[in-house]
Design a protein with these regions (language model features):
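Catalytic core of non-heme Fe(II) oxygenases with the double-stranded beta-helix
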Residues: 95-170, 208-213
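A structural signal for short, well-ordered beta-strand segments
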Residues: 86-88, 128-130, 199-203
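Short Ser/Thr-interspersed hydrophobic loop/turn segments at strand-loop and sheet-helix junctions
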Residues: 135, 180-183
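Non-heme Fe(II)/2-oxoglutarate
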Residues: 73, 176, 183-184, 188-251
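Short hydrophobic-aromatic micro-motifs
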Residues: 17-18, 177-179
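Active-site rim elements
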Residues: 58-61, 164-165, 186-188
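Non-heme Fe(II)-dependent double-stranded beta-helix
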Residues: 1-13, 18-119
Length: 251
C-alpha cells in the first residue's frame, strides 16, 4: 500500500522511492548470481547495456515479482497488473545515457498515461526499478521531469538530461523506484567507478500490452512460481463484467 504521503507524492511527481527494500545479504546474492552469468561487458549504447532472462535464475529474482513490500504498491496503482516486459541494465564509467522519452503525447502514449477521476488514479504502464548498486548524486543514472505524467504539451525536442526541469533521482543499493511511464524520463551518463546495476519490471493494466508480441514463458518457469506470480504472466484481456478483479491474485 501507499502511505498518504507516498500517494500524494506519486500523484504530484509521477514516482515514489521505497528505501532499503533489499538488505545487504539479498543484494549480495543477486549480484553474485549476475556475476556468475559471465555477461559481456556493458557497451556504450542502451542496447549493449541491457540483459534479460533473469527470471530463470532462481528465487532471488522471481521473488522480486511480487515482493511483500513493493507489490502492494503496484496493485494500488494497477488493481489488475500483468508483467508486460522486464530487463536489467548495466553501465560502466563513461557510458552514455538514454534520451528523455515517455509521455501520453509521445509514441508510447497508448500504453503510458495517467488520469485521475472520481478520487481514483488510472495508470498506464508502471515501472518498478530495483537498484542493485548505489546510484548517488553526481554518479548518473535515472533522471526524470517530475509531474510531466500530467503534461498537456509534448516534450521539447531540444531537451536532454541537462535541461533545468530534469531531476536526478538518487538511489542507494536496495532502494526501489516506482514510476509511471507517462512521466518523461531517461538516463544520465554514468560517472561512478563501480558498475550501475538495476533490474526493471514493467507492469501493465491487465487488458493492455505494449507490443503485439507477448513474452513466451517457459513451462518450467511457470511451474516454479506461486499462483499469484503465475497470474502476472497471463496475456492481456478484459474481464467479463461479472468477474471480480481481485480474483486474479491470491492475496
Amino acid at each position: 500500500m501507499l502511505t498518504d504521503e507516498e500517494r500524494f507524492l506519486f500523484d504530484l511527481r509521477g514516482f515514489v522511492v521505497l528505501r532499503e527494500v533489499l538488505d545487504p545479504e539479498q543484494l549480495g546474492e543477486v549480484n553474485r548470481i549476475i556475476d556468475g552469468q559471465e555477461l559481456p561487458p556493458p557497451g556504450d549504447t542502451f542496447a549493449d547495456q541491457i540483459f534479460s532472462g533473469f527470471l530463470s535464475w532462481g528465487p532471488a529474482f522471481t521473488d522480486l515479482l511480487d515482493h511483500e513490500r513493493v507489490f502492494p504498491v503496484v496493485t494500488t496503482l494497477l488493481p489488475r497488473p500483468r508483467l508486460d516486459r522486464y530487463y536489467g541494465i548495466r553501465m560502466r564509467a563513461g557510458t552514455t545515457g538514454l534520451p528523455l522519452h515517455g509521455g501520453a503525447l509521445e509514441a508510447d502514449g497508448q500504453s503510458e498515461f495517467y488520469h485521475f477521476h472520481h478520487g481514483r488514479m488510472a495508470n498506464g504502464v508502471i515501472t518498478v526499478s530495483w537498484a542493485l548498486t548505489d546510484m548517488l548524486a553526481g554518479q548518473g543514472g535515472f533522471v526524470c521531469i517530475p509531474g510531466s505524467h500530467k503534461s498537456n504539451h509534448p516534450l521539447p525536442k531540444s531537451w536532454d538530461y541537462r535541461a533545468e526541469a530534469v531531476h536526478h533521482v538518487p538511489m542507494a543499493a536496495g532502494d526501489v523506484l516506482v514510476f509511471n511511464g507517462a512521466m518523461a524520463h531517461g538516463t544520465h551518463p554514468w560517472h561512478a567507478g563501480h558498475e550501475r546495476r538495476s533490474v526493471m519490471f514493467k507492469y501493465a493494466p491487465g487488458h493492455l500490452a505494449w507490443s503485439k508480441v507477448y513474452l513466451d514463458w517457459a513451462a518450467e518457469l511457470r511451474q516454479s512460481l506461486s499462483p499469484r506470480q503465475q497470474a502476472l504472466l497471463e496475456p492481456p484481456y478484459c474481464l467479463p463484467h461479472h468477474e471480480d478483479p481481485t480474483d486474479r491474485f491470491v492475496r
